[in-house]
């Protein structure tokens, strides 16, 4: 049993950090309880121990703390989350406390929010298709169960609408196993929080979801704990309750800003653009908690969403995220300004595991071929449009004009499906064939003839 030690030796409080002197037997990540002179209590966590001094990060802010009268208790255990299957359908704050007016959770157990390291040998390869209902993802950048696939957005782009759409529509095809969504929002405004909660309530998606909401006016230090708390809940549902769990985390940029704020308070030597030098390592402790385990039915799939400052994909946050994750979905400001929703730019987007989750028995036999042909045709159509801007449309061949027509319809009908349309993978594939029928059959060089005979709409082919 852990021994609780109490001290009244607080020597300094700087921002979200507290220094406690003359401590003994204190450990890194240990949970700390602070009792103020008015009897109120706050929580913190040991961030660093040097000789007889402990640095504590405070989850609820440092205002109102009297150095002489504050009592600090070291509990001897890490920060833990009470977990239960009853968490599904509930809404929590950033520290895992219910905020939906419902009863407290009766925990089956308490789990360390930092989780357990997963042995690479124990990992199972991701290979099962997850349908999001969004053609640009399902067909062209397929999401696979156990994958981590981030969304790179920008300020003012509709990533919150995209996140809500995925939370509503995502499902594992051809599976009778339970599916759950863990939705974690960090540093969002009250209006954004209301949007997410109302959207999931109105559509009924709340019944299979767990929400963790950290508001912009909550302490920055809480923002660092929020994704770890959410991932702990996801791992519990996946590995102990055999559920397929999709974790949507928005906005990771707010998380990294909080990390930079705490690093500055600790007076650490800054790295690129003021972020701590351990930003990559810290992000990996979140992203690497996705995956499947050998012998376990459940899985954890991640969609981290981040807004790129100044739309700069070389910024440290998207740059380091791209190194750790398995692809990226990129939102385009140009498509957004043209009125396309969701404005997914499919050409620079990538899912590195898309070939593992597609094909006969998973989606359909023509998935990979049509995906490659759509990419090639869209790229060629974009080039033709750029050429027409420079030289005029008269410089285009008849085939080039067909590619331009294909590109326009691809953006208007395929990408621009709206935030309320839920397309099955079959509907996305059929729409792809309909668009490809605009082009001459001789241009469909990435698809086998027997597949063209089977799927290409005959009426369109006869018209040409």
From Swiss-Prot:
InterPro entries: ATP-synt_VA_C, ATPase_a/bsu_AS, ATPase_F1/V1/A1_a/bsu_N, ATPase_F1/V1/A1_a/bsu_nucl-bd, P-loop_NTPase, V-ATPase_su_B/beta
CDD domains: ATP-synt_V_A-type_beta_C, ATP-synt_V_A-type_beta_N, V_A-ATPase_B
Keyword vocabulary terms for this entry: ATP synthesis, Hydrogen ion transport, Ion transport, Transport
Statement: the UniProt record of this protein carries the keyword Ion transport: yes
Pfam hit, one: ATP-synt_ab
GO molecular function annotation: ATP binding; proton-transporting ATP synthase activity, rotational mechanism
Domain of life according to the entry: Bacteria
SUPFAM superfamilies xref list: C-terminal domain of alpha and beta subunits of F1 ATP synthase, P-loop containing nucleoside triphosphate hydrolases
GO biological process: proton motive force-driven plasma membrane ATP synthesis
Protein purpose: Produces ATP from ADP in the presence of a proton gradient across the membrane. The V-type beta chain is a regulatory subunit.
Stated family: Belongs to the ATPase alpha/beta chains family.
Record-given protein name: V-type ATP synthase beta chain
Biological source species: Streptococcus sanguinis (strain SK36)
């Amino acid at each position: 049993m852990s021994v609780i030690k109490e001290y009244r030796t607080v020597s300094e409080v700087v921002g979200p950090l507290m220094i406690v002197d003359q401590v003994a037997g204190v450990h890194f990540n240990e949970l700390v309880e602070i009792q103020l002179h008015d009897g109120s209590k706050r929580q913190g966590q040991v961030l660093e121990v040097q000789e007889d001094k402990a640095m504590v990060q405070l989850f609820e802010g440092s205002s109102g703390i009297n150095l002489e009268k504050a009592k600090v208790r070291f509990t001897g255990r890490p920060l833990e989350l009470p977990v239960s299957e009853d968490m599904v359908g509930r809404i929590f704050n950033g520290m895992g406390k219910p905020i939906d007016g419902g009863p407290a959770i009766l925990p089956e157990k308490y789990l360390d929010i930092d989780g357990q390291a997963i042995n690479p040998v124990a990992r199972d390869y991701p290979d099962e298709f997850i349908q999001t209902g969004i053609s640009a993802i399902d067909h062209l950048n397929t999401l696979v169960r156990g994958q981590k696939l981030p969304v790179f957005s920008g300020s003012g782009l509709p990533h919150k609408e995209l996140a809500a759409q995925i939370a509503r529509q995502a499902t594992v095809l051809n599976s009778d196993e339970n599916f759950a969504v863990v939705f974690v929002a960090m540093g969002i405004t009250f209006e954004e929080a209301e949007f997410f909660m109302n959207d999931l309530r109105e559509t009924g998606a709340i019944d299979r979801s767990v929400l963790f909401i950290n508001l912009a006016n909550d302490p920055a230090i809480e923002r660092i704990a929020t994704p770890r708390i959410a991932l702990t809940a996801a791992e519990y549902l996946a590995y102990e309750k055999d559920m397929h769990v999709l974790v949507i985390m928005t906005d990771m940029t707010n998380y990294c800003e909080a990390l930079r704020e705490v690093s500055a308070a600790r007076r650490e030597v800054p790295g690129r653009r003021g972020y701590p030098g351990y930003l990559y390592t810290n992000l990996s402790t979140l992203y690497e908690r996705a995956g499947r385990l050998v012998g376990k039915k459940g899985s954890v799939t991640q969609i981290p969403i981040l807004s790129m400052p100044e739309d700069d994909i070389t910024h440290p946050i998207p740059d380091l995220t791209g190194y750790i994750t398995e692809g990226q979905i990129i939102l385009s400001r140009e498509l957004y300004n043209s009125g396309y929703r969701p404005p997914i730019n499919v050409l620079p987007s990538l899912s590195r595991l898309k070939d593992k989750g597609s094909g006969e028995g998973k989606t359909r036999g023509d998935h990979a071929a049509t995906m490659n042909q759509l990419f090639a045709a869209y790229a060629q159509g974009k080039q033709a449009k750029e050429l027409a801007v420079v030289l005029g449309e008269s410089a285009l061949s008849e085939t080039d004009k067909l590619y331009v027509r294909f590109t326009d319809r691809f953006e208007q009908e395929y990408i621009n499906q709206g935030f309320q349309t839920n397309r099955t993978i079959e509907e996305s594939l059929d729409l792809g064939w309909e668009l490809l029928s605009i082009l001459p059959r001789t241009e469909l060089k990435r698809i086998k003839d027997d597949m063209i005979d089977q799927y290409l709409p005959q009426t369109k082919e006869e018209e040409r």
